[in-house]
Amino acid sequence: MFDTLFKSIFGSSNDRYIKRCRTRVEAINALEPQMQALADEDFPARIAEYREQAQNGRSLDDLLPEVFALTREAGKRALNMRHFDVQLVGGMVLHEGRIAEMKTGEGKTLVATLPVVLNAISGLGVHVVTVNDYLAKRDAAWMGRLYNFLGLSVGVIVHGLSDEERKEAYGADITYGTNNEFGFDYLRDNMKFYPHQLVQREHNFAIVDEVDSILIDEARTPLIISGPSEDSTGLYRRVDDIIPKLSPEAHFSVDEKARTATLTDEGVAKCEELLGIDNLFDPGNITFQHHVLQALKAHHVFRRDVDYIVTPEDQVVIVDEFTGRLMPGRRFSDGLHQALEAKEKVKVEAENQTLASITFQNYFRMYKKLAGMTGTADTEAVEFQQIYGLQVITIPTNKPMVRKDYPDSIYRTRREKFEAIVAAIGELHKSGQPVLVGTISIETSELLSAMLKKTGVPHNVLNAKHHEQEAEIVAQAGQRGKVTIATNMAGRGTDIVLGEGVRESGGLHILGTERHESRRIDNQLRGRSGRQGDPGSSRFYLSLEDDLMRLFGSDRISGLMQKLGMEEGEPIENRMVSRAIENAQKRVEGHNFEIRKTLLDYDNVMNQQREVIYTLRRETMMEADLEETAVEFMDDLFDEIYGDAEQGKGSEGDDAKAYAMARLRDVFNITRVLPLTDGQLPDRETARGAVLSILDELKRDTGEVYRDILRFFLLEEVDRCWKEHLLNMDHLRDGIGLRGYGQRDPKQEYKREGFSLFQEMLFRVRENLFRALTRLRIQREEQAPPEELKQEFKHKEEPKSLNYSGAQKETPSAAPERRGEPKVGRNDPCPCGSGQKYKKCCGA
């Protein structure tokens, strides 16, 4: 009540923000005559002048009016496009690190040039993030004319570039690319060996186009670089053969909401009989159990031409549920992709093991300043604020919106609904009004296409199978009498321009064949019509058999429709029913938000560990002399070995001193210079001196290559142990939910045990480093020249068999050796959570 009264008097916070921007818009407009008087060659000189002022301490906020005015004039001359006043406001929103919600056709691509130019002046680089390679190349070439006119350099990052080309693109003032390419380049940089191999600069400022698609829709899917693991392809085929012999309900049940399958007791017994094993739940048979559940999902949850397609080359390719695009190169996780390959009787590819991973949430939060643009963000404003700290500002349209959004037409069955859709399309086609038909799957678009062919209505189909003609089909969709069927239009990035005489016949009509589980995707489809004040209309056709209605809202809506007494083929258009559907969508959105938030909570634990490892790698790469680091690592190990001996800790069957001597032999190969024949543990300083003498001998034998040897072995061990650690964390994550049954918080347990595993991993790095160094011998009489030695100790090149995917990976492996209590090394992060190294905090 109070909020409503406050808004009626003072306006919403959004209105007040827009009002505050008007003063600066007037200041920019006042500078227009001054900029119009400049000669073309004056523009790069002005940018150089502003760059110098910024370097001398003048703030970008202070420079904003002049730079925006200069960019607006450059747009007129280079592109023949002038920024509207509302676009200037959009530019201010982006510069301040917020999200600008702008309707379709309001010129988001042009708006981005304003903050891009302003922030490029700093010389620290600006990243413009798009949803696909086509848009990255298109926008870089299109807006590049404006940037080049101003004397700024532009780079573009797309799939298939070499490291040299990527480095050059990142070195430009402005870099366009996709979210996947930026994320994978970050991960790849943290697998490199020498500083000159790094391609990315620091993460200064990013503008994310279609920000809702990238930061929300794709946030459930982490970026993963993986390599091949053990081959278990035969097992997938063996398990797939038994699935047709299992009966629904009797042997298994499917939860469509959660997209899971579960075996019944009878199903477990049947599987044991068919697989010829005694106990499916025996630890030795855990792999069978996992494969059976994945095979059930492949057969009864995932649908061909909806969730994936099979290409003419017999490859299973994922279909993006939000955009309808194919995602070649990405694979479902947890062996699900292999289960689908077995189901479709194509070649089953080997499983992969995670080498590096990050979520989009944590990648984009690394930027000093982050901003975004989209046509539909307001429905997710709370999530943007909570997770990314980004405020959504709705920018007014340049011309009033006149599109008519009609109420939903709801039918009892899918058959009735599709018959009504075909009839409606036929009527609209006769009248000359173009129709864009939105479907949520390839299966539906092809079904509708077949029905239209029978009635003789000419039409185009745009889905993941026909993406080559995408831009051409979309561009023609606004012509008189055109009928275009398209899977989800999110991120298509091509405006639909109305043809001659179309405005008079009502503009483009949007016909939705089903509600998506996200209101935002529905709004994106609607937003294709009514751009820049054009006329248009929209209507959704639904049935009680649609997935959303069936799973999330059917009982209540079905009851309402029975009360209203519907006849066969008769639609209902009722606001109460539409509200019930919207509430069902809100429930699904809330459910998906919780999934993303949980993913982030768990990834935050991994993120802290990732930062420590990547910082260690970066310091190892950059450090000219690693000898001091090696000695510190050695002292950490001595602290542990001699500390355990003093406290009487040993392994089973060994006394503490015997165990300490065994560790000295194993880790440091100490008997090479110090015999331990009398069974006495040498004092710490004697043992330390012995290890230093081994290192000194290695240093004398290798000369200047010694530093490269230290770097090589340290990076090798960090990478190998980190890879194993990622696998162990995957296993921990998979089983941690069960802790809830023991009245323990799974997230806290994951954090606690994850920290323990991480500390052990850091100690394994130190141990393995010294195992390698103290056993390395150089034959003096056959000693290689320094250059050959350098080549010998160069880091291995990136394996060619790496996979880049957007899903979590899990493969079974033996549990790591566990110590009783994790030790904290002096260079490790302090357990108190201060963020400092232990030696500078509690260990000082």
From Swiss-Prot:
GO annotation, cellular component aspect: cell envelope Sec protein transport complex; cytosol; plasma membrane
Catalytic reactions on record: ATP + H2O + cellular proteinSide 1 = ADP + phosphate + cellular proteinSide 2
Cofactors (names): Zn(2+)
Origin: domain of life: Bacteria
Pfam families in the cross-refs: P-loop_SecA (PF21090), SEC-C (PF02810), SecA_DEAD (PF07517), SecA_PP_bind (PF01043), SecA_SW (PF07516)
UniProt cross-references to SMART domains, sorted A to Z: SecA_DEAD, SecA_PP_bind
Family: Belongs to the SecA family.
The protein's name: Protein translocase subunit SecA
Organism: Nitratidesulfovibrio vulgaris (strain DSM 19637 / Miyazaki F)
Species lineage: Bacteria, Pseudomonadati, Thermodesulfobacteriota, Desulfovibrionia, Desulfovibrionales
